[in-house]
Amino acid sequence: SEMCIRDSPVRQEILTAKKEESRKELGLDNRPVVLSFGGSLGARKINEAVADLVARSGIDGRYQHIHAYGSYGDWFPQLVEEKGTDIADCSNLDIRPYIDNMPTCMAAADLVICRAGAITLSEIQAMGKPAILIPSPNVAENHQYHNAMALVNAGAADIIEEKDLTGAALMRKTDKMLLNPEKLEKYSENSRKMAITDANERIYSVVKKVLGLV
């Protein structure tokens, strides 16, 4: 017999983290919060594009930005500084190699910029977070693109394919979303509608059936 499990388990902390509490914990104010990351190794194209957005936020202060550049992206802070922003002098910028408190950071965010892996998308949906998705082109059967398009077609996210990714394109898309609160709220609602928050229970139920325990 075949067993097909499509649901990705969501960490309990993702389901319980609260926006206002998380912002307070992170020392954030009422300005829009952008969270961006490209995975634990980082992604060069994402880092290069995000550097433009981070540098501009450092100069004009319009957004608060949390960005993880990954283990191969240690050149990122230097790139931002070359664009005219001293990260150390900008209280609205939180730039680090890794995010080890993802539930808190994601809860605090108004917009998430990231890849389109299944687990990441499950967490975004569970929290109802609007997203700009940049699918990795280096995966089997282009599955991240298809993952992303499921959210785009549901009105829960926007997409920028890596071949089209530039700092200017990312800034345009970010501004278009964050300057439209009604659109953000609609994206949030649609994302949350897609959420499967009981994946652990579903998987447990299927496994029990396969093992003949029910």
Where are these regions (language model features)?
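C-terminal alpha-helical cap of glycosyltransferases
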Residues: 196-214
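Donor-nucleotide binding loops and adjacent catalytic segments primarily
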Residues: 19-24, 28-114, 145-149, 153, ...
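Two-component system phosphotransfer/interaction surface
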Residues: 166-179, 208
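Short beta->alpha connector loops at strand-helix junctions that form conserved
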Residues: 6-8, 134-137, 160-164
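Short beta-strand->alpha-helix junction loop in the catalytic core
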Residues: 6-15, 39-43
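Short, small-residue-biased leader/transition segments that mark boundaries at the very start
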Residues: 1-5
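A donor-sugar binding/catalytic signature common to diverse glycosyltransferases
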Residues: 102-143
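A short, well-ordered alpha-helix in the C-terminal region of glycosyltransferases
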Residues: 183-197
